[in-house]
Amino acid sequence: MSSRNFWLSKEVFIGLAFFFAITVPVVVFGGAKVVFVDKSANGAEDGTSAHPYQSISEALDHVKKGTEVRIKNGEYKENITIPKDVKLVGDSENRDKVIIKARNEDKPTVQMKDETEMSYITVKGGRHGVRILPDTKAHLYNVVVKNSNRDGIHIDSAKTDKRHRVILDTIEVTRNDRAGIFAETRFITLINSYITLNKSDGVDFAMGTEAWLGDNSFSGNKGSGIKVILDNSSLSSKKNTIRNNGHDGIEVNTYGASGTLTLKKATIVKNNSYGIARIARTTKGANTFGGIILGDGVNVNKIDQNNQGSVSHIIYGF
């Protein structure tokens, strides 16, 4: 009896094994969440690791929501749009190994739709290096953006809530022909990043922006390190270094609506004009600079050695 049960169990086991041998590859590959790209590949292309797509664009044409597109080392000369809920990941944690360079310099090199992510990649050239489209949530991690014809990263407007937040973490934005980062009204987190050597401002935030800036360096930009419009904005900053910029360390503009800019543990030094410039764009704007809040005690800022002084008088810019 026990022997018969044993053999029945083996038969069932063999049958199940045969079933899974047939069905599991269909489940794994049919519902695959990772698609591979390798420009040096030859032959058939189906997005598997054995037969990767040869271009990022081809891979993106075939992906579904929830897919990760993993890119092998190399320079890919393309302009791409990342579809909704797709991740673009360089295969090496050395972000200089995977380069996306604009084929058409009149278009953004990379455009990002809603719930998209990009990491371990260098983006070069294009009208903008990266354009984050309206009403989207996006995340960049360990990315370099450089040599674009306009803004390095251009962020279109959205509601200022977590659902539409843009997270920029451990990025380098450098040598772009306009601002390093330009943002319309948004909720933005910028941390652990270098914004350097851009031909206009390091970052330029429109009115109504909510932003957290932490542990960043803004240096060597031809404009101001940080440029903001205070009206209806809520901006918080801690442990940022803003130095050697061609204009002000921070340029604060206002048209008269209230807003806040909180600075803690900032180092604002050796900028060509003021450490902090206060520019009223209307008569009413001259009365709203109380929204600039400077940390004290353990949160005190170092604002020193700026060519025209630490904090400007109110400058009338109209």
Regions found by a protein language model. Name each.
Residues 39, 86-131:
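Right-handed parallel beta-helix/beta-spiral solenoid domain characteristic of secreted/periplasmic
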Residues 1-8:
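N-terminal secretory signal peptides that target proteins for export/translocation
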Residues 91, 97, 115-125, 137-149, ...:
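Right-handed parallel beta-helix
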Residues 40-44, 67, 74-75, 92-95:
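Acidic glycine-/aspartate-rich tracts in secreted/extracellular proteins
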Residues 68, 76-82, 99, 103-108, ...:
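Short glycine/acidic-rich loop motifs that flank beta-strands on beta-rich extracellular proteins
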Residues 27-58, 91:
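Right-handed parallel beta-helix/beta-solenoid
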Residues 60-67, 114-116:
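Beta-strand repeat architectures
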